[in-house]
Design a protein with these regions (language model features):
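Short, flexible segments with low predicted structural confidence
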Residues: 18-26, 129-130, 184-187, 276-277
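Short Pro/Gly-enriched beta-strand edge/turn motifs at strand-loop
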Residues: 56-68, 137-141, 285-289
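N-terminal pre-ligand scaffold of iron-sulfur
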Residues: 2-100, 104-111, 157-159
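Short linear motifs in intrinsically disordered
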Residues: 62-70, 146-148, 280-285, 318
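C-terminal catalytic domain of Rieske-type non-heme iron oxygenases
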Residues: 2-5, 93, 99, 159, ...
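N-terminal short leaders/motifs
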Residues: 15-44, 106-122, 154-160, 232-265
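Rieske [2Fe-2S] iron-sulfur-binding domain
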Residues: 67-171, 175-182
């Protein structure tokens, strides 16, 4: 569904009004709560504010460690208009840099994934090692005050958690991502051993909606039996069995077991980590602000959502599977098997796209009812409380 950008009564809502409305909504208990105010999904002032408070400051997931397994492997990602470059080092560490030459700030590479022994600026051939140090700057000896050591790439803070790579544009992040997510790992997702999952797909998509519309769609499974008849509904999880996790400033999650203990959605027979109901349980979680994961015993699907405007976002997504699942796929069948996974996920994405774009369209209406939450939509309320605090 293609939506044309439109001006509505919320477009020019002043930041003060959006913040006030958000504060009022999030102050209510979950039992009395209503959905987030439409201003925060349509106001240009609020959009600019969240770019500064959220995407220029918070930890952002940009991919998986196994996507860059070898020294010199790299990936790039755009965060709020800033291109970042993530490179595997000789030491096996992962380092992050601003993807801009230290001379006059030309982007060093436009490749999304690649391998390099050095990065050479296409403008004036300044050349950097994979550690970001300037190795060569043609004819700069003509300037007596020039010092190569003062002209390295701008370094970024990076961290790895459960096989995911996170980066922040903040010079002084308040808290590390691993520390923030310690209890989520310990109590819920650590038992799945996500570091053992191997990436088989990395794609991206652009949708015509506010980025928060997708966060809300992903963090509730109330819609799944109705909206996903060709995909996720087939796992047959009962709405009554969903449980929402504890309140946290850093994440939210919900989980439910599927009906079958075998086949798609269930653990491989060689999986020794998962016990009891967890061998057939899905966990949907969001690492605030924009990292979404559906975690199952036989695969995970991750999404990193990046706004491109009030009514448009880009979502980078990938699929990874445990090694024991891969071991059962014959080499000659691998490509067809991956294509089937891509087709399945594309179908699921299309099922969601119309919902998300309709949500954005409907919420710009000049008159709206109060709205309400279903009991298994608590994650939306938790996300709203995070937004309230981070944008205050």
């Amino acid at each position: 569904m293609k939506l044309n950008p439109v001006l509505n009564k919320y477009t020019n809502a002043p930041l003060s009004l959006s913040l006030k409305r958000l504060q009022e909504c999030s102050a209510r208990s979950f039992e009395l709560a209503s959905p987030a105010p439409p201003e925060i999904n349509h106001s240009v002032d609020f959009y600019n504010h969240e770019q500064n408070r959220i995407f220029n400051q918070e930890w952002i997931c940009i991919g998986r460690c196994d996507e860059i397994p070898t020294a010199g492997d790299f990936l790039t990602h755009d965060i709020a208009g800033t291109s970042v470059l993530i490179v595997r080092q000789e030491s096996n560490a992962i380092m992050g840099f601003i993807n801009a030459c230290a001379h006059r700030f030309t982007c060093l590479t436009s490749e999304k994934l690649g391998h390099a022994f050095a990065f050479t600026c296409p403008n004036h051939a300044w050349t950097y090692g994979i550690n970001g140090q300037l190795n060569h700057a043609p004819f700069m000896e003509m300037k007596s005050s020039f010092n190569k050591n003062d002209n390295n790439l701008e370094r970024l803070h990076t961290e790895v958690w459960e096989g995911f790579i996170y980066v922040t544009l903040s010079k002084n992040p308040k808290k590390g991502i691993a520390e923030s997510l310690e209890m989520l790992s310990k109590n819920i997702v650590g038992q799945y051993d996500m570091t053992d999952y191997k990436t088989i797909i990395r794609e991206s998509m652009n949708w015509n909606a506010n980025w928060k519309n997708l966060i809300e769609n992903f963090t509730e499974s109330y819609h799944v039996p109705i909206a996903h008849p060709k995909t996720f509904a087939n796992h047959k999880k009962r709405i009554q069995d969903y449980e929402c996790g504890e309140d946290s400033e850093h994440y939210c999650y919900h989980f439910a077991p599927q009906e079958s203990e075998n086949g798609p959605g269930a653990a491989h027979k060689d999986n020794k980590n998962l016990k009891g109901k967890w061998r057939r349980t899905m966990v949907d979680f969001c690492i605030f602000p924009n990292h979404l994961v559906t975690l199952m015993p036989d695969y995970l699907w991750w999404v990193s959502v990046m706004p491109k405007g009030v009514g448009e976002f880009k979502a980078t997504w990938g699929v990874a599977v445990p090694q024991d699942i891969l071991n059962d796929i014959a080499e000659e069948d691998h490509d067809n098997w991956v294509m089937e996974k891509i087709e399945y996920m594309n179908t699921a994405n299309e099922e969601d796209r119309e919902l998300v774009e309709r949500l954005h369209q409907g919420s710009q209406s000049i008159r709206l009812p109060k709205g309400a939450y279903h009991p298994i939509e608590k994650n939306l309320w938790q996300f709203m409380k995070y937004l309230t605090k981070i944008t205050a």
